[in-house]
A protein has these predicted regions:
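Active-site "gating" loop of Rossmann-like NAD(P)-dependent oxidoreductase/epimerase domains
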Residues: 1-10
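Amphipathic terminal alpha-helices
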Residues: 157, 166-183
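Mid/C-terminal beta-alpha module of Rossmann-like enzyme folds, strongest
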Residues: 87-141, 183
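Catalytic tyrosine of NAD(P)H-dependent dehydrogenase/reductases that use a Tyr as the general acid/base
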Residues: 10-13, 40, 66, 93
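NAD(P)-dependent short-chain dehydrogenase/reductase
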Residues: 22-76, 83
Length: 183
């Protein structure tokens, strides 16, 4: 639940986010704190752009299959944030696109599947093999990552906000926008 106070950040980054949330909540009476996960959008780096770049340059990829979550498209998120700002339904919220949770491996497979459907055959299974591995098999990363990044969005619905579209739809819209550009 978004209002749960049983926090356990895994790293310094998570700790700093929590301290920021607490500073806002302890200072203001009216605030929105919106927690998101697996964010992708037009600007900056993200997992999708990384997989597309790696997929162009390698014929074999290994991707973790034991970390799960749900993607969040910044375009969809921005529309919701406008709706929230125009309301007085303050508090903590969890937001991701709808469509259920997936692993990073499943997400990669769907990225490539949709890219092929949009005419980019360089991402088909004849050109790229994607192999699932555990986090332990993949090796060390820069920071500890949660195995379960699912967020409970029930408060968002109870407050009357419209849920974000399905993540597969969001991915399709995003890929349509970026695939013919250099990223």
């Amino acid at each position: 639940q978004p209002d749960c106070k049983n926090y356990r950040p895994l790293n310094i980054y998570g700790q700093s986010k929590l301290l920021g949330e607490q500073a806002v909540a302890n200072t203001l009476d009216k605030y929105f704190i919106v927690r998101i996960a697996w964010v992708f959008g037009r600007n900056g780096k993200n997992f999708i752009k990384t997989m597309l770049t790696v997929g162009k340059n390698h014929d074999k990829l290994t991707v973790v299959n034991d970390q799960i979550g749900t993607p969040t498209y910044t375009f969809d998120l921005a529309r919701l944030l406008i709706d929230m700002a125009e309301s007085e339904k303050y508090g903590y919220y969890h937001v991701t696109n709808e469509g259920g949770y997936i692993s990073w491996y499943d997400f990669t497979k769907e990225i490539f599947r949709q890219a092929v459907a949009l005419g980019h055959t360089e991402y088909d299974e004849d050109h790229i093999t994607v192999t699932p591995v555990t986090t332990a098999e993949y090796g060390a990363s820069k920071a500890a990552r949660p195995f379960n990044s699912r967020l409970d969005k029930s408060k968002l619905i109870q407050a009357g906000f419209t849920p974000l579209p399905d993540w597969k739809d969001a991915l399709q819209r995003y890929l349509t926008e970026i695939l013919n550009e250099e990223f």
